[in-house]
UniProtKB/Swiss-Prot annotation:
<dbReference type="InterPro" id="IPR001848">
    <property type="entry name" value="Ribosomal_uS10"/>
</dbReference>
<dbReference type="GO" id="GO:0005840">
    <property type="term" value="C:ribosome"/>
</dbReference>
<dbReference type="GO" id="GO:0000049">
    <property type="term" value="F:tRNA binding"/>
</dbReference>
<dbReference type="GO" id="GO:0006412">
    <property type="term" value="P:translation"/>
</dbReference>
<comment type="function">
    <text>Involved in the binding of tRNA to the ribosomes.</text>
</comment>
<dbReference type="InterPro" id="IPR036838">
    <property type="entry name" value="Ribosomal_uS10_dom_sf"/>
</dbReference>
<comment type="subunit">
    <text>Part of the 30S ribosomal subunit.</text>
</comment>
<dbReference type="GO" id="GO:1990904">
    <property type="term" value="C:ribonucleoprotein complex"/>
</dbReference>
<keyword id="KW-0687">Ribonucleoprotein</keyword>
<comment type="similarity">
    <text>Belongs to the universal ribosomal protein uS10 family.</text>
</comment>
<protein>
    <recommendedName>
        <fullName>Small ribosomal subunit protein uS10</fullName>
    </recommendedName>
</protein>
<dbReference type="GO" id="GO:0003735">
    <property type="term" value="F:structural constituent of ribosome"/>
</dbReference>
<keyword id="KW-0689">Ribosomal protein</keyword>
<dbReference type="Pfam" id="PF00338">
    <property type="entry name" value="Ribosomal_S10"/>
</dbReference>
<dbReference type="InterPro" id="IPR027486">
    <property type="entry name" value="Ribosomal_uS10_dom"/>
</dbReference>
Amino acid sequence: MSSNQNIKIRLKSFDHRLIDLSTREIVDTAKRTGAQIRGPIPLPIRKEKFTVLTSPHVNKDARDQYELRTHKRLVVIVHPTEKTVDALMKLDLAAGVDVQISLDD
């Protein structure tokens, strides 16, 4: 790793408990290996709302509404070491969390 590179880890999940747990694991692992951390930064929650008619034919007033919330977090690891990268690769996160990793100069 170059000394001036940063690792940006972006997490997405529908369950806020899972994303908080995964974020805590990433932060603890990075701190344990001696890297500096920026975050976790909570990003805006994306809310999708769906309205479905409950009746197949009549009663337009009878509807159900559903909401799907996507929680997002950003963790930036400043000046990571080889030890940090190895520890993050071995980390086993929850199945309901989408992880995107990018390198930033």
